[in-house]
Amino acid sequence: GICLGHQLIAKTYGGQIDTSNTESYAKVEINIVNDENLFAGLAPKMEVWSSHKDEVKTIPDDFEILANSNLCDVESFKHTKKDVYGIQFHPEVHHTPKGSTIFENFYEICKKKV
């Protein structure tokens, strides 16, 4: 899920969503803490275009954080047992220079399941 989809995944699985401490719509540098799968080839940092009005405050059980930033503790997460991923930022816009790599990595994850 991207942005709201990321938040809906968290809420559906029992996580907590709330208003961001710093509302912003801007370029942000994220810290990639797990560069397997979704962020393969992108660590340790990446510039992204992010929207922070609401955000995931607490991840659900069986999820792990993949990326964070100085504005948001949960920029990205994944389920530990399923191929369920969420990202707060927007990889689809040109303001996220390496966003297409995230989509390519996600496509590779999906191909392994077919």
Residue ranges and their predicted role:
Residues 1-41, 47, 97-105:
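Cysteine-nucleophile active-site neighborhood
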Residues 3, 52, 90:
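Active-site glycine-centered loops adjacent to acidic/histidine catalytic or metal-binding residues
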Residues 21, 67, 88-89:
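Residue-level recognition of conserved beta-strand positions in structured domain cores
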Residues 27-29, 74-76, 86:
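Conserved hydrophobic/aromatic beta-strand scaffold that supports enzyme active sites
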Residues 88-114:
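Acyltransferase
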Residues 35-82:
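Catalytic beta-strand/loop cores that center a nucleophilic Ser/Cys/Thr
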Residues 24, 50, 88:
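Short aromatic/basic micro-patch
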